[in-house]
């Protein structure tokens, strides 16, 4: 099957039919050309004209089935700072390490990294290891540190 556009999103329009999922790594959401297999074994070639993909995008809808995109469940940390000081220290340390993060409500989400637990303990911030489907790609902003 070949698809080249998004026809809707599950969060806005829940299909009443069977949903076949295409699972992507979070960094594949920005890719325009992909070849994937749904969780029901259907081959799908994705060639997007412009935009990338978003969690829940519907790529195909037939009489009895819809094909939608979701990200893979992956290990992550959810960090819950209790004060602005904890938030500031956590944000500083994550930024200093160039660790991409997502902030939703009062929580910070980062992909699992075995070195981060020690950092969170040192800061004294509340955190837990969990699994999460990241709904959007992390944004990397490359730059160089100059020490003259």
Curated annotation (Swiss-Prot):
InterPro entries, per database record: UreE (IPR012406), UreE_C_dom (IPR007864), UreE_N (IPR004029), UreE_N_sf (IPR036118)
Entry's Gene Ontology cellular component terms: cytoplasm
Keyword Chaperone part of the UniProt annotation: yes
Source organism superkingdom: Bacteria
UniProt-listed GO biological process terms: protein folding; protein-containing complex assembly; urea metabolic process
Pfam (any one): UreE_C
Gene3D superfamilies (UniProt xref): Urease metallochaperone UreE, N-terminal domain (2.60.260.20), UreE, C-terminal domain (3.30.70.790)
CDD domains membership: UreE
Main location: cytoplasm
SMART domains: UreE_N
GO MF term set: nickel cation binding; unfolded protein binding
Compartments reported by the entry: Cytoplasm
Sorted UniProt keywords: Chaperone, Cytoplasm, Nickel, Nickel insertion
Family the UniProt entry places it in: Belongs to the UreE family.
Biological function: Involved in urease metallocenter assembly. Binds nickel. Probably functions as a nickel donor during metallocenter assembly.
Descriptive protein name: Urease accessory protein UreE
């Amino acid at each position: 099957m070949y698809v080249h556009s998004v026809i809707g999103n599950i969060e806005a329009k829940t299909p009443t039919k069977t949903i076949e999922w295409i699972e992507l790594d979070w960094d594949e959401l920005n890719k325009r050309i992909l070849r994937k297999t749904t969780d029901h074994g259907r081959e799908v070639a994705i060639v997007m004209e412009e935009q990338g993909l978003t969690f829940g995008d519907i790529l195909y809808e037939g009489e009895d089935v819809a094909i939608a995109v979701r990200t893979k469940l992956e290990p992550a940390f959810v960090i819950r700072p209790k004060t602005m000081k904890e938030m500031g220290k956590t944000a500083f340390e994550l930024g200093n390490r160039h660790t991409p993060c997502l902030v939703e409500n009062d929580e910070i989400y980062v992909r699992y990294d075995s070195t981060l637990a020690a950092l969170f303990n040192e800061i004294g911030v509340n955190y837990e290891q969990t699994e999460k489907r990241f709904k959007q790609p992390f944004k990397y902003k490359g730059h160089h540190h100059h020490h003259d």
